Each structure stands twice: as C-alpha cells, then as structure tokens.
C-alpha cells in the first residue's frame, strides 16, 4: 500500500500453494487468492508454440491464464495469442476487471476462473 497508494485486494500465492489457514489470513487482510484455470507451464518447457497450443486448445470464457513475463518465449507466445484470442471474440482484461464483471471476488476465497 505504501508503494502503490492502494491496498491490494487480490494475491497470487507463489507456486499456487495456499492452505486453509493461509487463505483465512488472506481473507482477514481483505484479499482473495487468485489461481489460474490454464497453466501453460511456460516456465518448464520455454517453448512459445507449445504455450500457444496449450492456451488455444483449452481457453474458455472466464479463464485465468498463467504465463510468466520473465521468459522471452512467453512474450513471443503473447504476441501471437493476444490478436488470436481477440479475433476469436475474447476480451482480454485484468483479473480485477474480470472479477468485477462476474460479480466480484470475496475476501478469503480462492478463484481459478470467473464464469
């Protein structure tokens, strides 16, 4: 909050690991835990085409896609995926925008998609 000027309301647990106790703490802090419905495993294979294929074969409305911006292959995949998903009728939004559109995210709850 001191750095960005607002209190965070969403958090992604490192590695996607969160237990009941941690989720309770997150909720007491007014936050929801955000997971993902499509894991591209881009960190493991570092292959742009494989990332593209994974997303395009699995994507559905309301999905949260996990990709890591620290790999050039993930950035290369995004350059292809963004126009392709848009052409298929998807609107790319932030998780906050997606949650708000689908009724919001309750503190102390875990979400991997919003449908």
Predicted regions and their residues:
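Catalytic domains of cell-wall/extracellular-matrix polysaccharide-remodeling enzymes
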Residues: 1-112
């Amino acid at each position: 909050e001191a750095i960005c000027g607002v209190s965070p309301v969403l958090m992604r647990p490192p590695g996607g690991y969160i237990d009941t106790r941690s989720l309770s703490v997150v909720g007491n802090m007014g936050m929801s835990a955000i997971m993902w419905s499509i894991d591209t495993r881009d960190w493991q294979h570092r292959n742009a085409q494989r990332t593209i294929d994974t997303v395009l074969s699995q994507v559905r409305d309301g999905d949260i896609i996990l990709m890591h911006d620290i790999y050039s292959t993930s950035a290369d995949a995004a350059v292809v995926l963004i126009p392709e998903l848009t052409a298929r009728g998807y609107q790319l939004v932030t998780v906050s925008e997606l949650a708000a559109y689908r009724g919001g995210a309750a503190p102390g709850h875990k979400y991997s998609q919003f449908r």
